[in-house]
Each structure stands twice: as C-alpha cells, then as structure tokens.
Regions:
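Walker A/P-loop
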Residues: 16
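Short, structured coil segments at secondary-structure junctions
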Residues: 25, 54, 123-124
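ATP-dependent NMP and nucleoside kinases share a basic, alpha-helical "lid"
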Residues: 94-101, 107-135
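Post-Walker A helix-loop "phosphate-sensing" segment adjacent to the P-loop in P-loop NTPases
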Residues: 23-32, 44-45
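P-loop (Walker A) phosphate-binding loop of NTP-binding proteins
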Residues: 10, 22
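ATP-binding Walker
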Residues: 13
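Hydrophobic anchor at the beta1->P-loop junction of P-loop NTPases
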Residues: 5-7
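ATP-dependent small-molecule kinase phosphotransfer cores
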Residues: 37-106
Length: 135
C-alpha cells in the first residue's frame, strides 16, 4: 500500500504548489476540495441527506443550488457541522477507494485545507504543513 501524504496549510500558503511539485514526481494527488464539490453534486447519499436537511429545491433539475447550500452553511457553526457530517464521511470513503486504485504507487497525497479539522489526518501516514509568510 502507498504511503499517504497529507498536505495542509492556510489559504495562499502554497498547498497547490507543493501538490504540483509532488505531481511532477508522478505522485497521484487527491484534491479534497475538488472531490468534495464533485461528490456533493453527484453522490446519491450526499444528495439524499442534503435534500432531507434542506428540502427538494436544493437540487433543481438535478443541479445543486450552490447559493442555497452556501447560505445555510455559513449561517451558523451548527449548520456547518451538519453539512460537514454529511459530506466528510463520503469524501473519506471516496479517498479510500481512490487510494486502492493507486495502490501500485509508492506514495499518494491528499491536499486539504482542513485536514485536521475534518479528521482526515487519520487517513494519512505523514502530514506536510505548508506555511508562507505574508511578505
């Protein structure tokens, strides 16, 4: 099994730069933000649970109403916890499947701005914390 590298850091810290460097070394990169967006739009479990929480109009014509989701998500910390409790487990499951697909690789990497906050640190073997000063 591949060694799983977690890449995290604040906004503008250079996570994407580190990911690109690792990618140049042929290390597969799982971009958790992108995958969470993809799963929120397509995963049946997420769609069902979000619809149960926010109503059928969340997916209009099968398309996610991002504004409605964002309005709810950012209205309170409690709302964010509810949304994260729906999405994060599915992203973790997807990451595990993705790792299985890349099991022949020596290393794989997971880029996540909220690696620790989301509990994804338990999914990786080593963490790279990216930090860049403001100047």
């Amino acid at each position: 099994m591949a060694i799983r590298i977690g890449i995290t850091g604040g906004i503008g810290s250079g996570k994407s730069v580190v990911s690109k460097i690792l990618s140049l070394l042929d290390i597969p990169i799982y971009l958790s933000d992108d995958e969470a967006k993809r799963l929120t739009a397509t995963d049946e479990t997420i769609r069902r649970e979000l619809t149960d929480l926010l109503g059928d109009e969340l997916y209009q014509g099968g398309i996610l109403n991002k504004q409605k989701l964002a309005n709810y998500l950012f209205a309170s910390a409690d709302n964010a916890e509810k949304i994260n409790a729906i999405i994060h487990p599915q992203v973790k499951q997807d990451f595990r499947r993705w790792c299985t697909c890349h099991s022949a690789s020596q290393f794989v990497a997971l880029e996540s701005a909220i690696l620790f906050e989301s509990g994804f640190d338990s999914e990786v073997d080593v963490v790279v914390m990216v930090y860049a000063p403001q100047e």
